[in-house]
């Protein structure tokens, strides 16, 4: 294979080129995710996308967003692509608008729930789905300089198209039909992020009596002690305000967690169970099947089976849920973390849309979320521990660590069919995730502590 630099964007990155993780490319903004890198990423994405039309770019509120968008735009236009900049928006707005305007693809500059200093790039193709593994590999090959490229025949241009976001808000409102929230007291935690661009407006349009927390875009405070990763502010506000429910979003608003009037957490498993039950009763759930990941609670699975349903599990990542739903014609799927995908709403995780569905379904059926939660299922005790490990261990070394594997087998034998163990490497952070769940809390505590200690001892050895 011929190695050559692309003159318009500088030398190739060689072996130091980053790869795509479970949700695009992420890293510390300015260093791991530098403007120089984004210039090349933009260029190779522009060359890999095959459809005609502009490339859309949105971003969350992080302070580094404008810098990275500028670099990506430079790379894309160097690749001959026209760029339409959407500005601050929720991630699900990008795939929706790609399909609506016939774009060649789109990018979202966000690190989702990560700290403010991080940032990332999510990439979508012309169909609005995440860029395929094959095309991701082609971008990576280009970054390493392992492909010939004669360059484009033209230079693209960039225009501002924030006006398109009105179409996304209209889609949110139309998703609930004629259901309304007149006078319903609701609290929203917008976590200083993308949800500030639209969530409060659509809830107010539907008539909700709204209290908003962290409601302005703030790139230095996004996800800091708020939002879906820290629910205490929302729980306290819901109880103090006497609200019937509250919703917290992550940095780019593609996921959502709720709390009821008593401050109890309603996670993605509960949303799937509750929304799935409505669809099942309406005979609108093919095969009575829900799709979730290996992280979903065993109590959820057992309860759904008692309703006569089937729960299909996938690896972690909404792209895996999406693939399974498409393959099997499923109507609803998602992740415990709050990514919910509905076939009737474009199969794209959308935290604001999910919150609207949950709120209007409750109000339309004249049932409080707390009562609905009581009727759902009792989650098995579940504990997740993150063990910081070297990158080489995170990528593949942990799976061949015999002491850790033997400890996992011991834990599984101890709990039998009433428990589960899941050890997996994070796709976005330098950690190994150790999860244990069982009907017996003492077993959960015991085995989580033991497995985390084994991972730390053997994977962090000098």
Swiss-Prot record:
TM regions (residue ranges): none
Cofactor note: Binds 1 Mg(2+) ion per subunit.
Keyword Magnesium: yes
Record: active site: 112 (phosphoserine intermediate)
Pfam families per record: PGM_PMM_I (PF02878), PGM_PMM_II (PF02879), PGM_PMM_III (PF02880), PGM_PMM_IV (PF00408)
GO BP term, example: carbohydrate metabolic process
GO molecular function, one term: phosphoglucosamine mutase activity
Modified residues (Phosphoserine): 112
Catalysed reaction, written as an equation: alpha-D-glucosamine 1-phosphate = D-glucosamine 6-phosphate
GO cellular component: cytosol
Post-translational changes noted in the entry: Activated by phosphorylation.
Assigned EC number: 5.4.2.10
Superkingdom of this protein's organism: Bacteria
Reported cofactor(s): Mg(2+)
Residues annotated to bind Mg(2+): 112, 250, 252, 254
UniProt keywords, alphabetically: Isomerase, Magnesium, Metal-binding, Phosphoprotein
Family: Belongs to the phosphohexose mutase family.
PANTHER family: PHOSPHOGLUCOMUTASE (ALPHA-D-GLUCOSE-1,6-BISPHOSPHATE-DEPENDENT), PHOSPHOHEXOSE MUTASE
Record function comment: Catalyzes the conversion of glucosamine-6-phosphate to glucosamine-1-phosphate.
Protein name stated in the entry: Phosphoglucosamine mutase
Originating gene: glmM
